[in-house]
A protein has these predicted regions:
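Catalytic centers of nucleases
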Residues: 257-276
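Acidic-basic catalytic patches of nuclease active cores, encompassing PD-(D/E)XK
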Residues: 225-258
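Conserved catalytic cores of phosphodiester-cleaving nucleases, focusing on short active-site segments
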Residues: 246, 270-285
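Phosphate-binding site recognition
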Residues: 1-238
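Coil-to-beta-strand transition motifs
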Residues: 2-3, 152, 265, 276-278
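Catalytic cores of nucleic-acid endonucleases
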Residues: 285-294
Length: 294
């Protein structure tokens, strides 16, 4: 007989009828007993790959501790229920050991085009994604993508559990690690801004160089070009569109500089710090520069 059969996939499927055998499946997605079943814990990493960690550190020219910290930043961070240990993405982790390089291994196995279409369809505020709050019923829902894209994005592995309010049964979500966050935000850029997929990585590089050298004129000229050729459909959601583009740009710049980004009542406040310069910016729709300085 079969003692334990394990089925895994991306999103949940519905129970087709009251007579279906599939109705007897036990969903273990958020069960504490199984939180480590699909990944690698920090303890397992050090107990089984300690020699490889030292070799990886030597290849990268890093100390052992810094290498471990960077691995955790890039590939750790998955939590499948509240108050659970962090889990490494095994595919990315093992490829990093294989090539001894920090790459976007899992992200490059598939493109989240469908998820981006969901976000745009529902006019989703991208800044909210980093601190979305919801309950277990929504996270485990099957067809809620028709009104809410978050369950599908969570089930696909682009968001994970970051915190839990036990009193209200509310989960706080966020990106699990840098590989997923940077990869997903980079993927979003051509879908929201006036830039093609080939040029996108170079545009981010130019943004960073311009703020680091104090060339703010070129920086803002490049930023304005991202809003060119905005379609009529987008104009109807103009304020949200501008906020989303600015969020993407400064989130990407923030991977290489220090950025504090806040939104409030149609206004965006930003502090951007490099080694030589500190920029304080305020963006306001349908307002003048003088009004923003008040």
């Amino acid at each position: 007989y079969i003692k334990f059969a394990f089925l895994t996939g991306v999103t949940k499927f519905g129970k087709v009828s009251v007579f279906s055998d599939l109705n007897n499946l036990d969903d273990i997605s958020m069960r504490k007993d199984y939180v480590e079943i699909c990944g690698v814990s920090d303890q397992e990493l050090h107990e089984n790959l300690d020699i490889e960690l030292h070799e990886f550190a030597e290849t990268q020219g890093l100390s052992y501790d810094k290498l471990c910290t960077k691995l955790k930043e890039y590939y750790d961070g998955y939590h499948f229920t509240h108050n659970s240990i962090g889990i490494y993405n095994p595919f990315s982790l093992l490829n990093a050991f294989k090539y001894k390089e920090f790459g976007s291994y899992w992200f490059e196995t598939g493109t989240p085009t469908y998820l981006v279409k969901l976000l745009k369809k529902h006019h989703y505020d991208l800044e909210q994604m980093a601190h979305e709050e919801t309950d277990a019923q929504v996270l485990n829902s099957i067809d809620s993508e028709s009104t809410n894209p978050i369950p599908v994005i969570y089930q696909s592995g682009y968001l994970t559990i970051k915190g839990y309010d036990e009193r209200f049964g509310i989960y706080r979500l966020g990106f699990p690690n840098r590989e997923v966050e940077e990869g997903f935000i980079r993927f979003l850029l051509p879908f929201y801004a006036n830039v093609n997929k080939v040029e996108s990585p170079f545009e981010v590089q130019k943004f960073v160089r311009e703020v680091e050298t104090g060339d703010y004129d070129s920086f803002f000229h490049r930023l304005q070009s991202f809003f060119a050729d905005t379609t009529y459909e987008v104009i109807r959601e103009q304020e949200l569109h501008y906020e989303n583009v600015l969020f993407i740009v400064f989130k990407l710049v923030g991977f290489y500089t220090k950025v504090e980004y806040h939104t409030n009542d149609g206004r965006i406040d930003l502090v951007l710090q490099t080694e030589k310069f500190i920029y304080i910016m305020e963006f306001k729709l349908n307002g003048t520069a003088e009004e923003a300085l008040q």
